[in-house]
Each structure stands twice: as structure tokens, then as C-alpha cells.
Amino acid sequence: TAQYEAAEQDLLVRVSQAYFDVLTSEDNLELVQAQKKAVGEQLASAKRNFEVGTATITGVRDAQARFDLSNAQEIAADNDLRIKRLALDLAVGLSNAKPKRLANNTKLIDAPTEDVSIWVTQSEAASPAVRQAQLGLEIASLEVNKANAGHKPTIDAQLSYAGARNLNGTATTALSSSNHVFSPSAAVVLNVPLFAGFTTMYRVKETVALEDKARSDYENVRRTTAQATRTAYFGLVAGLSQVKAYEAAEASSQSALDANKLGYSVGVNINIDVLNSQSQLYQTKRDLAKARYDVLVGNLKLRQATGTLTPADLQPINALLAP
């Protein structure tokens, strides 16, 4: 059952990761296209200003270079989306799967309130990998006891029942029937092995070595699971903080872009200032979208690390998706 649970949890995380990878790629492509459109508008503006003599050729060249870069980014983003969709189709066993997006103004999950040590303790008790390694250690210990039993005395119970024919018909003290005499007997036999060769000794050494290996494997799995739990925990906490930071950065980047556009229109700023502000805004939007998806997957990875992930944990995520 531990192997089944581990496989089920791994499947849940892999499918969820593939699902949100597609959404990340879709957002990335849309934002690249939006940035390309904005750069194109800025390029057209720079050309007009150059033609009337209010801007230099440098502004046109800067905008053209940024527009050409946007073309390359669009091609890469489109290809990445195709690959991510193929990966999702493979994970779910369907063709042309259409994942739903997150609803607008979606509030993500809350940060875990428990201390990381509580999650680590839970992982050591519930993780399928830890339980499987512990079972392997217990079996190895039983094999050692079984091998050691070859050096120990054994007690056997023997029961016999003999019959003989009474030819002269004289009376006997044993059970008799007609001319036959039946003699039951019982005995307890103690066997003390003095020396049974080196087979038993070598078998004991082998099982002890296997037990040591099983114990080492168990400790390694336990430490690895604890480390994975801490990594998932701190990753989730940091991810939630990143989302808030990116939301603030998005608002600031939008304000900076608006200010640079206004400055450019009155001749205070140059074209490259607007282009840089556009690039920063759309990069922040992409980072924010990815951070939101990473938080949702990170929550599943934390539960997987502790061994408590079930299909029911997907329901809160489904509730965040647009209808």
C-alpha cells in the first residue's frame, strides 16, 4: 500500500504541474504578444516623431530592435506552449486538453500556520517512502532472528503408536484388541546443536549485514524526506511572499510606464525609457503569473512530502478555476 500511495501522490503532483505549466505558457505567450503590440505602437510613434523632427533616429532604432526581439520571444513562447500541451496530454491520457484558467481576482491559499517542525514530524510518520523503508528494516531484523535460531537448541514433541500381534493370548498391560496389542508413546526431545558447519554462521553474518544496510537506508530516507519537507515548506512560504511582492511591483511598474509615456509625449523622456518600462511591466506580469501557479503546486508538493496528499486536496484548487 505504501508503494501505491507514493505512486498516487506522484501522479497528482505531476498532472498538476503539467496543468499549470500549460497555463504559465499560455500567459507567457499572451503577455509577449501584448508587449509586442505595445512596442509596435511605440515604434510607430517614434517614426512619426522622427519624421517631424521631434525625435532622433536613435529612438527609432531602439524601438525597432525591441520589436524584433519581441518577434523572437513570441516564436519561443509559442513553441514552449506546444511542448507543454503535449506534456499535459501525455500526463492525462487525452488529446488537446484544455485547462481552465484561474478566476480573476482569485485569492490564493493561506500560508501554513504550523511550524516547519510539525510538518517534518508528520512526514516521518506518514510518508510512504519512510514507512516502506521502516518495513524493510523490520523484515531484515526478523531475518536476523531467524538465522540466529540455527545456533539455539530446539525442542521437538514426538508421538508414536505401535501395534503387535499377541500369539499366545496372554494378558498385557497395553491396549489390546483380540490378538493384537497397541502401544502408544509420547516423548519430548531436546536438540542441542554443537556444530552444524559454517553455513549457519555465514547466514547470520549475511543477515546482520543486510539489517545494517536496511537501517542505513531507513535513516537516509527519513533524512531525505525531512529535507524535502523543509524545502517544500519554505518554498511555499516564500512563494506566497513573492506573489505579494510581484503584485506591488506590477502596480509600481504600471505607474512608471504611465509616467515615462507622459514624459516622452512632452519631450522630457526618450523612447528607450518607455521601452524599458514596458519590458519591466510585462516581465513582472509574467513573473507574477508563474509565482501564483507555483504556490498552488507548492502546496501539493508540501503535502506530498508529508505523505498526506490525497485527491481531495485538489478540490480547493478546482474552486479557484474559472467556470
Question: Would you name each region that the model predicts?
Answer:
Residues 10-122, 235, 239, 280-282:
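Periplasmic alpha-helical coiled-coil/stalk elements that build and connect Gram-negative outer-membrane
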Residues 297-323:
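Gram-negative outer-membrane assembly/targeting C-terminal domains
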